[in-house]
């Protein structure tokens, strides 16, 4: 079963590119740029990756991002993640990036976007990797700051397909960002938002009704609201669920308690994702394997989760059909 899961063609739709920065690369880039980290070595960094909640993780995540200053830094980080996709049969990836984490440190948004997109282009040329970018606003900052970020980003609009909302959820409801999401939609961008991870089901309603999102990132707390569940089923609104992340941040106490397969069996369009894999102990295959070991998960369920990931993507219908054909071919042979 593990070999089946490793070989399974899949798409990842919930991945923060800054959260893929492995400690080794963090140190390498830090040395290159003369940025001192508050850790003596890689082992110390890994030891610090024990979190009790989302905020404890975010504090370390923003520290790690301090090393990223130049276009090449963003290139190296992105290319390393896309190489991991190649190894794990993630044949399409939609990556979040957090421009405010960098522009607030004086890094130009163009430097960020050029570094990311150059890596994406090289991965496509070298092995046919499919990928897209989604710009995320940090919800612990003001909506005015998000509006300014969108303004700075729009000259590069051809490089990203949508906008999202991430960072500290509780106390920062989606309604806080209604205007900037309207502006993004008017500019032709798709919308997604983190909701219902630590925040209540009400935040999922707001994301759907006020931000008009096409996907909910996380969304696992929808199970507390029957009417919301029904709507997510009826409208087939995808949930980009991150199992290992949820355990690492104590959203669930253990993988055996995770509700992803219950949501799947009820007819919700759930997908498996790694969120911040360098911090949460696993990329896509590690997430699938952890689920299979703890829940357990059948081949049919794994195949449906993979199918959902392509159907929920922001690819064109032709591109979806091409990647789904690769999945079907794999399933026929396995």
Swiss-Prot record:
Alphabetized InterPro entries for the sequence: A_deaminase_dom (IPR001365), ADE (IPR028892), Ado/ade_deaminase (IPR006330), Metal_Hydrolase (IPR032466)
Active-site residue numbers: 197 (proton donor)
Molecular function GO labels: adenine deaminase activity; zinc ion binding
Pfam families given in the database record: A_deaminase
Top EC class of this enzyme: hydrolase
Record: residues binding substrate: 276
Binding site for Zn(2+): 14, 16, 194, 275
Organism: Hahella chejuensis (strain KCTC 2396)
SUPFAM superfamilies in UniProt: Metallo-dependent hydrolases
PANTHER family assigned to the protein according to its UniProt record, in alphabetical order: ADENINE DEAMINASE
Cofactor note (record): Binds 1 zinc ion per subunit.
Role: Catalyzes the hydrolytic deamination of adenine to hypoxanthine. Plays an important role in the purine salvage pathway and in nitrogen catabolism.
GO biological-process terms attached to the record: adenine catabolic process; hypoxanthine salvage; nucleotide metabolic process
CDD domains: ADA
The enzyme's E.C. designation: 3.5.4.2
Residues marked Important for catalytic activity (site): 218
Catalytic activity: adenine + H2O + H(+) = hypoxanthine + NH4(+)
Family listed: Belongs to the metallo-dependent hydrolases superfamily. Adenosine and AMP deaminases family. Adenine deaminase type 2 subfamily.
UniProtKB keywords: Hydrolase, Metal-binding, Nucleotide metabolism, Zinc
Cofactors demanded by this protein: Zn(2+)
Protein's name according to its UniProt entry: Adenine deaminase
One term under GO cellular component: cytosol
